[in-house]
């Protein structure tokens, strides 16, 4: 059980509720007896009775005299529609995410919906906890950004619970391979292709790639990077290719880039393809620290057209991300699913990437 500072009966209540919400226990399934639960968690029968009593009162459990306690069936959608929308993104206040959230928020508020915001910090345990919290609310729908979407979905039970509870949801930026729901995203592979194609056409052959591959966006951008090389019949310089995880994003790419730049001129890369603008801006400083300049000594490209992509002396060549528009369209899609009760007819929205050429790249 979690949250050790809570009273024991509330800790137990949360634990049993997680069994139900995650789909570990199904509707009409009998739960363990008071005696079994008390033994399992080393609690008094009174504490167990208190937790079960609250869950029964709230409609999560029901009793049959002489038979035991069972998991309730989901309430019909019409009984719980309070015009409340949950938004769960990897981040809320960082990078491009405020623009996405703002677009969704303004659209939903215009339609009279109340918002619940949560972030996962791209951590699967945090995603589990946030989904658990959201499902406890009387939600009309959810907008969700998957957490480490390339690494599978250990929280699948919660998504199945959303289906069982008839709560529609839309995913943004990526979609878990195991989940079937509408998605609003970029064509990340084509974006990676356009950036790399641009550099190859400028004459670059030793191109370093930095991709965060615990998210599908990074996997797809890497795929585009490789496809551009193949289309131009240019070998991928695998010794200049780096895959990294979310936890390494502030350290590993910078360390590796520094090592690349310290090589003799004839051995170092002539261009960097970065997973996003956030990384590209960090690498601009690494390049400067090595006494090199962009684009004279090395070209660099980012992804997303972040606000700061044009805030420095070097203006980044990048791919434009729809940001606010993505939030608006995700919200509009979800409202349609809620109000028209149509899920099967809703298709994905996939944005075609637009290459923005600025002064961070140069022909060689």
From Swiss-Prot:
Q: Which residues form the HTH gntR-type domain?
A: 6-74
Q: What SUPFAM superfamilies does this protein's entry cite?
A: Periplasmic binding protein-like I (SSF53822), Winged helix' DNA-binding domain (SSF46785)
Where it mainly occurs, coarsely classed, is cytoplasm
Return the InterPro entries for the record. AraR_ligand_bind_dom, LacI/GalR-like_sensor, Peripla_BP_I, Tscrpt_reg_HTH_GntR, WH-like_DNA-bd_sf, WH_DNA-bd_sf
Query: Any idea which GO molecular function terms this record carries?
Result: DNA-binding transcription factor activity; transcription cis-regulatory region binding
Task performed by this protein? Transcriptional repressor of the arabinose utilization genes.
Return the protein name: Arabinose metabolism transcriptional repressor
